[in-house]
Structures are given as C-alpha cells and as structure tokens.
Amino acid sequence: DARAGVTYRHPAGVLFLTQFTQVAMATLASAQVAEMREAGVFDESAVTAGHSVGEYNALAAVTGTLELGDLLELVFARGTAMHHLVPRTADGESGYRLAVVRPHLAQLSHEQADALVRSVAEDSGELCQIVNHNLRGKQYAVAGTVKALAELERRLGTGRNGKSPFLLVPGIDVPFHSAALLDGVPE
C-alpha cells in the first residue's frame, strides 16, 4: 500500500480531511443505490448524474463502470490531491472555507449577490468566489478565505424571518471549484 506509514491528522478529526470525506460520501452513495436496488425501487432506465465527486459515485454505483474498491481509491487520490493544493499551517488548518449564500434572504437579486461577492474579493484582496449556482437567486456555494467569508457574512446582514442569508458549511477547508485550485489542473 502506497500510504503505509502515513499518519493523517486534522484538528477536528480525520473525517474533516477531504480525502476521507470523499471516501465516506462515495461509500454512502454506493450503499444507498444498492439499498434502493435491493428494495426494488431503483429505476434502471432513469437518467442519473452527479456533480463533482458525485460524478464518480454515479459511475460506480449506478452504471457499474467502476468497482467500489476502484472508486474508493480514485476519490481518495482526488481528495488527497485537492488537500495538498491548499497551503496549511503546522496544525493542518487551511484558512479556506465554503459557505452557502441565500441572496433572497438578504433581499438581493442574482446580479446584486454576484456583485457583492466580487466586491468582497476585490476589497479584501482575498479569494471570495461563487463556485456553484445551486438555485438562481436562492442558493449559491461560495468559496473563500476565512477573512473574506467573514466580511461577506457581515455585508449580507442578518436576513429575514430568523433565517440567515449566510451559512458556513462545517468541516470544509478546501475551496472546491475555485480559482485557488487551478494550479492542480493541467492545461
């Protein structure tokens, strides 16, 4: 095994390391599809897709293109590569986080939310980038530094009806799908 003798550490526990999180997600997805098949509720003719690590999960669990063991090796290697693309302190902290922004709760349009995120990046000189528009005007994934995301949260305000327009995603310290990871993608 190429990882023999390697010790993995994270201040919050190894499941917060993306390589282990991705393995856990792949294992869960495969188990869920297997359970649906066993229960007779999985529609084999349905179109199935995944996003990001979910693409690998769909290939393995749904199509059988990848065996489970190969899937787990692949997503572990993928997560390890992403983990190492991000500078870290001696304690393993990266200085990056991922947040969910809900523009409608701050009474912002799609364009206003996009401009706000860009202005935080420009004003702070740090990464703050919408990396996925999950639902236009309702839910965006934003990657950034701890400092930039704190400023974004401040500018978004408290929201309405007791619902915050800003939610920090716990346990994520890799700025997935952002410009910060471009060095890891060959041209």
Regions found by a protein language model. Give the residues of each.
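Alpha/beta catalytic cores of group-transfer enzymes, especially the acyltransferase/condensing modules
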Residues: 61-187
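FabD-like malonyl-/acyl-CoA
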Residues: 1-113
